[in-house]
């Protein structure tokens, strides 16, 4: 593409992504996992977050043992320098901004190496991917920053493989691809599977610079350096390597056939839709998606094997198919159960393969006609579900986990941040309450994480000077039901606290149950 086409398609693609994902951003409620990276951000406005915050020398380094507080830090800068008040709109916009920026950078980096038709096809495939749209808007994985980094990675790969420039000027690109993979692993350890794409990249670009791999390894080491430091620190304290602390041999109960189907049909967004909206598209769409994508990838492989000596684009398309297949093999090897927010790491490698193959098949008219027909079918078939998803975004349709009542809970928490204490008796409400209070210290507790939740809540309430206590129950996690009941029983039987009717505004909170306790006269 020429410079004008590159700028134009980059801007249009980024704008389209925003338009498709930013409709009524507060219509769905805030989900617990969606906000798990937010508490650490309040460190930057003077709070002392404990939830999902693993500090190193006082600075939040990790949100989980396997994920870095990068998004937390960026949003923390927003709170400190732009607007000190948390909102679900600004939080969701940050994830959208990540992907929009990544998409823009992809076209700017790879634009000179792409045909216009390839760029358009790549954009259409990515922007019609329901999983991409839903997980970008509702970044519970998290997935948004990781997708942005992969877009940059693929852009650099295309530039390295197809750009005619050789020599030392390319070495910074090798260093940068290594850095991007390193940052991806730092952002979430499950992205370690990107070592496979990095290896394939180095193989496909080895003629560009024989020492390029050294620069890539250097970039990789630099990107993962904070993670290495964190693990050395925990090991030195006798706690072992923190990133391996949640490794398990449990791989879940998903069968091989079901996994392959879910992997190939991810573009229809069946699993994200079920989680966010509580609905699932007709199975026909999923099977058609899987069949169409498989057919396209087979055509690419067949063409690449026949034309590997003559077409660099076809060879590269074949490399992207190999990457997509390698990632499918890699995910089950992760020592932890995986789900759609892990599998989406394979996107958009498959789209890069399809986009590259389109102009490269020009010499094989029959194969090209079939390829174009299937690609058009794949995109058109997504349109009905794309329309449904956009309508769901706008209308506020939601599952119990994303019920709009969670946004109401956040607003109610904000009004009680000075005079009340909140207890989340089970999983699913604490991050929302904490963010609603704008990072109020010692404001919300989760006793269910402890073996004796009843004693934990007695200890918490005996140390507070607040006179009002709200107990929030979501019922989402059945495994916490007994702990939740024990917490409520401990307060009901307490001589210090007595049950009281909740205020009218707390009474209508959908699937969320809220109980109020006030300090008794005897407790005074």
Regions picked out by a protein language model, each given a short descriptive name:
Residues 69-73, 81-101, 139, 283-291, ...:
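Loop-to-helix entry region of an early transmembrane alpha helix in multi-pass inner-membrane enzymes
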Residues 19-20, 35-80, 236:
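Extracytosolic helix-loop segments that constitute the early lumenal/periplasmic catalytic or substrate-binding loops
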Residues 40-43, 47, 183, 195-300, ...:
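Transmembrane-lumen/periplasm boundary regions of multi-pass, lipid-linked membrane glycan transferases
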Residues 10, 89, 93-114, 152, ...:
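Transmembrane-helix motifs of polytopic, lipid-linked glycan transferases
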Residues 31, 135-143:
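Short acidic/glycine- and proline-prone juxtamembrane loop motifs at membrane-interface regions
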Residues 340, 368-418, 426-444, 448-451, ...:
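Membrane-proximal, lumen/periplasm-facing interface regions of secretory-pathway glyco-
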Residues 2-5, 111-118, 165-171, 205-216, ...:
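Membrane-interface helix-loop-helix junctions at transmembrane boundaries of multi-pass membrane enzymes
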Residues 38, 96, 136, 193, ...:
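Hydrophobic/aromatic-rich transmembrane helices and adjacent perimembrane loops
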